[in-house]
Amino acid sequence: MAMRQCAIYGKGGIGKSTTTQNLVAALAEMGKKVMIVGCDPKADSTRLILHSKAQNTIMEMAAEAGTVEDLELEDVLKVGYGGVKCVESGGPEPGVGCAGRGVITAINFLEEEGAYEDDLDFVFYDVLGDVVCGGFAMPIRENKAQEIYIVCSGEMMAMYAANNISKGIVKYANSGSVRLGGLICNSRNTDREDELIIALAAKLGTQMIHFVPRDNVVQRAEIRRMTVIEYDPTAKQADEYRTLARKVVENKMLIIPNPITMDELEALLMEFGVMEEEDESIVGKAAAAEE
């Protein structure tokens, strides 16, 4: 099969890296050849696959070596569980420079060094938070990733971020081949969460590709720096990630999304009881004034 390049976006803290690594572990278990490119200065996109605290990043090693041209592919590419290839782009120290530049530098380096030529089935880009700047949009802006999956939950800000990311996809979809493959609901156990994300997906013109339930085995595995697939392959949660992997492999629904307005998003949240009807009479009133 031709190599598929997928980017995983979503609100910060939503569980993108955990979801991506468990999905990738399930793909590796299926016999797929996969590479993860971490596009986040935290460099935590590969820790569960490599059983390490944080992988040395391309930007760190380039700074030590002098320039990125002084690096070799084997310096930055590590192989972990199931033969998964792992690379972290990294970024500058907090408050210094543009982390998005790290993503651009890393992907260009990997291309020049032939990292993509090794009969890979999938490349996954695990991308920082929202599409916050042009650098982080690089995997979709430069037509590197053709498929985008957005990790979200039934919480308002996660849905707001999913809608914002959809706007970013539209911006680049019209001039390139990038498409939205679906929403992955990483459950926070909010009320009617699966129905809400199915409804949001329908409004965006996409699908909820899978609902990943909340399970404490994920945290138990993470403490050991392992995916659930490796830590407890018999766990029900491991089967959830296997189902997600199978759905991604079989996914043919790749669309240009139809982002909604803030008013439409709020109306959806009110419909499902996540947000109360707006009452102008209470706006700006402190608790003491309401007594």
From Swiss-Prot:
Any one Gene Ontology BP term: nitrogen fixation
GO molecular function annotation: 4 iron, 4 sulfur cluster binding; ATP binding; metal ion binding; nitrogenase activity
InterPro entries: NifH/chlL_CS, NifH/frxC, Nitrogenase_Fe_NifH, P-loop_NTPase
Alphabetical list of Gene3D superfamilies matching this protein: P-loop containing nucleotide triphosphate hydrolases
Entry's EC annotation: 1.18.6.1
Binding residues annotated for ATP, in chain numbering: G10, K11, G12, G13, I14, G15, K16, S17
Keywords on record: 4Fe-4S, ADP-ribosylation, ATP-binding, Iron, Iron-sulfur, Metal-binding, Nitrogen fixation, Nucleotide-binding, Oxidoreductase
Top-rank lineage group of the source organism: Bacteria
Cofactor(s), names only, from the UniProt record: [4Fe-4S] cluster
CDD domains linked to this entry: NifH (cd02040)
Residues given in the record as [4Fe-4S] cluster binding sites: C98, C133
Enzyme kind, highest EC tier: oxidoreductase
Matching Pfam families: Fer4_NifH
Cofactor note text: Binds 1 [4Fe-4S] cluster per dimer.
Protein modification: The reversible ADP-ribosylation of Arg-101 inactivates the nitrogenase reductase and regulates nitrogenase activity.
Modified residues (ADP-ribosylarginine): R101
Annotated catalysed reactions: N2 + 8 reduced [2Fe-2S]-[ferredoxin] + 16 ATP + 16 H2O = H2 + 8 oxidized [2Fe-2S]-[ferredoxin] + 2 NH4(+) + 16 ADP + 16 phosphate + 6 H(+)
Assembly behavior: Homodimer.
Function: The key enzymatic reactions in nitrogen fixation are catalyzed by the nitrogenase complex, which has 2 components: the iron protein (component 2) and a component 1 which is either a molybdenum-iron protein, a vanadium-iron, or an iron-iron protein.
Family recorded in the similarity comment: Belongs to the NifH/BchL/ChlL family.
PANTHER family: LIGHT-INDEPENDENT PROTOCHLOROPHYLLIDE REDUCTASE IRON-SULFUR ATP-BINDING PROTEIN (PTHR42864:SF2)
Other facts noted in the record for this chain: This subunit is associated with the molybdenum-iron nitrogenase component 2.
Protein name, as recorded: Nitrogenase iron protein 1
Organism expressing this protein natively: Azotobacter chroococcum mcd 1
